[in-house]
């Protein structure tokens, strides 16, 4: 599928991959001549909810940045593959890489500010972005990670309890599982069984940020009231030990749900990706 509307957006699905990821290419009215920005949303969200409705796409377009958005498998307008492999984090990262190249991203070249790729992730998207940045050193220029964590909460998700709840309404004892499942059920665009497949695939590929650490400059952001805020200095230490230059930003009064809507977050990210000093 393809089309254009506000913000000069082109949309299509990724050809030749099972997930049929829904991709949006958003063109700025005045191009700043900088590398494109890939946005990766969180669990049970979508590019529209995570990035468009919250003003991220418009903020980046106003800064002259070309923006690439992707709906993860089973989310938003992407397909819901039946095979488990399509939901594995490693497969998703491979599909994101293909998406970036299809959108015109190319390896970093010294002295060429339009080469390479900047990546912004939120929640689950931060996990994917961290691993993507660690494995794609010739492509990724800078990272912005919102609501990141030292461990993936989905790894502790109680799949059996979730399946029982969906089958007959049996109460879920684990609070995190109950919260994540109910959040996923709120969005009609989500394929709940596809999302459970994603959880199962994530359990099969445990997240260990120390195993592969990005060497690029990164901005780590969390809401003050988000329990994941405690992960920021730990991730920063990992990044620093790998030779990165991490910066941290804590958003006063914000939690994991509403941090992504923060104007201060967007402004800091736009400046950071452009290599500018904090305002």
Indicate residue ranges for each PLM-predicted region.
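Conserved alpha/beta-hydrolase
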Residues: 60-79
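Conserved alpha/beta-hydrolase "acid-adjacent" motif
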Residues: 227-234
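Short beta-strand/loop motif that positions the catalytic acidic residue
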Residues: 214, 220-222
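Catalytic histidine-centered segment of alpha/beta-hydrolase-like enzymes
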Residues: 254-264
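Flexible "cap/lid" loop of the alpha/beta hydrolase fold
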Residues: 127-135, 140-170
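Active-site nucleophile elbow and catalytic-triad environment of alpha/beta-hydrolase enzymes
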Residues: 194-210, 225
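The serine-hydrolase catalytic nucleophile loop
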Residues: 44-57
């Amino acid at each position: 599928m393809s089309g254009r509307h506000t913000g000069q957006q082109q949309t299509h699905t990724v050809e030749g991959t099972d997930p049929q990821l829904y991709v949006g290419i958003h063109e700025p009215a005045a191009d700043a001549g900088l590398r494109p920005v890939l946005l990766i949303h969180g669990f049970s969200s979508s590019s529209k909810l995570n990035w468009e409705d919250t003003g991220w796409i418009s903020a980046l377009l106003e800064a002259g940045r070309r923006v690439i958005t992707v709906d993860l498998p089973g989310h938003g307008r992407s397909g819901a593959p039946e095979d488990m492999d399509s939901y594995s984090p490693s497969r998703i990262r491979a599909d994101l890489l293909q998406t970036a190249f299809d959108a015109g991203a190319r390896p970093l070249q010294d002295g060429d500010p339009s080469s390479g790729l900047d990546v912004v992730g939120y929640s689950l998207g931060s996990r994917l972005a961290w691993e993507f940045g660690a494995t794609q050193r010739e492509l990724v220029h800078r990272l912005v990670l919102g609501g990141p964590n030292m461990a993936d909460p989905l790894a502790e998700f109680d799949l059996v309890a979730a399946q029982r709840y969906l089958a007959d309404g049996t109460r879920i004892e684990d609070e995190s599982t109950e919260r994540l499942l109910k959040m996923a059920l709120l969005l009609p665009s989500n394929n709940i069984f596809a999302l459970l497949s994603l959880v199962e695939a994530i359990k099969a590929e445990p997240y260990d940020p120390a195993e592969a650490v990005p060497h690029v400059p990164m901005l780590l952001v969390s809401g003050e009231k988000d329990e994941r805020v405690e992960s920021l200095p730990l991730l920063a230490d990992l990044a620093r030990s790998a030779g990165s230059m991490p910066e941290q930003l804590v958003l006063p009064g914000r939690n994991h749900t509403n941090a992504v809507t923060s104007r201060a977050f967007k402004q800091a990210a736009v400046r950071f990706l452009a290599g500018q000093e904090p305002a």
